[in-house]
């Protein structure tokens, strides 16, 4: 597919710290966080004027699902817009708590694990053609996704019986299956539940739940952009070497724990390859494919360049060439510098605090955004574009229809219901519009509905 629909769903960690008032459980804090949402949406599960979905997921995790995007920079802008929306809710919740005598601080983290060992995810969605065998796609994709943490991991201090170590991925130790229709119970690499949110005759939705949440815009580009390129190869029928793994769940952990990239992976055919060799194989194939077929979007040259530089940096052990662009390397540089200045080990509480605060979405408090304000990380999207995405949907996908409908209904105080494919005015019989084409941003039926609303 030359054009593809993308989406990212992010679950956020939430906590509350107060020196002089009673502690609040995450569930209580989440209720304060969503009180404003419930007041206008009558629910903690709403669609916004920018086409996105905002809701409370299982337990106490706020979740933001971007609108449908057909460009990677657009996707990153809408993912970042979700952070701004939630950060605004944090300010509202903080004020409400203070008015009720709670003088603590609410924190939202865009990470994947908490101190109790719980994991929450970053799920990627890719529209793929219905044609073709899904099992073949999964066989080719899983070895790539297991090793993708080298180029897209968020980094994490891991406590082990042998002491603290730094790992590529936050999510790797919490994945339990290769493919499954469950998301929370078994945490597979690929979720197979067939909910295309599009015309099921032509499309299917690939739901990847193995990835880390990314603070870095360039790492987010790598996470999604490399999958897009590998999918294009598979869809074009490119023959790949058989790299099916004997035990992908064991391998994903062993790879995460070895920053040299040389963790050996036993394949189903008995051969052994390192994580670096597997990634290099995909990079070589993708590069040849792009050379033969051309770049299908303007981001491809950067993706291929950063992919190659990251693998070379891991191989050499010198990450200076990527420590403004790849999350795990950015964070490691920050920690190494702090440890050196203060003579601290990796297991020091202050280093654990750095590990966490890197993911704080607060623009005034989070360490990643402190680095960004100093020009210490590479940008892809202007702040003005991100701010526009807080209110405005992507103009090139179905999200425009949904966002425009939600905005008009809210302005006029009309009772409505929406989901990914339906638009409905509840105060009119037979006023449900089914929007099955996610690429379609103009629809005469929706125009007529908006006009009829006044």
Curated annotation (Swiss-Prot):
Q: Which GO terms describe its molecular function?
A: ATP binding; ligase activity, forming carbon-nitrogen bonds; magnesium ion binding; ubiquitin-like protein transferase activity
The positions annotated for binding Mg(2+) are 9, 55, 63
Q: What class of enzyme is it?
A: ligase
Q: Name the residues annotated as catalytic in the UniProt entry.
A: 57 (proton acceptor)
Q: In which pathway does it act?
A: Protein degradation; proteasomal Pup-dependent pathway; Protein modification; protein pupylation
Q: Name one GO biological process term.
A: modification-dependent protein catabolic process
Keywords per UniProt: ATP-binding, Ligase, Magnesium, Metal-binding, Nucleotide-binding, Ubl conjugation pathway
Enzyme Commission no: 6.3.1.19
- What reaction is this protein's catalytic activity? ATP + [prokaryotic ubiquitin-like protein]-L-glutamate + [protein]-L-lysine = ADP + phosphate + N(6)-([prokaryotic ubiquitin-like protein]-gamma-L-glutamyl)-[protein]-L-lysine
Summarizing the function annotation, the protein's role is: Catalyzes the covalent attachment of the prokaryotic ubiquitin-like protein modifier Pup to the proteasomal substrate proteins, thereby targeting them for proteasomal degradation. This tagging system is termed pupylation. The ligation reaction involves the side-chain carboxylate of the C-terminal glutamate of Pup and the side-chain amino group of a substrate lysine.
NCBIfam families, per this entry? pupylate_PafA
Other noteworthy facts: The reaction mechanism probably proceeds via the activation of Pup by phosphorylation of its C-terminal glutamate, which is then subject to nucleophilic attack by the substrate lysine, resulting in an isopeptide bond and the release of phosphate as a good leaving group.
Q: What is this protein called?
A: Pup--protein ligase
Q: What does the record give as the organism's lineage?
A: Bacteria, Bacillati, Actinomycetota, Actinomycetes, Micrococcales
Q: Which gene encodes it?
A: pafA
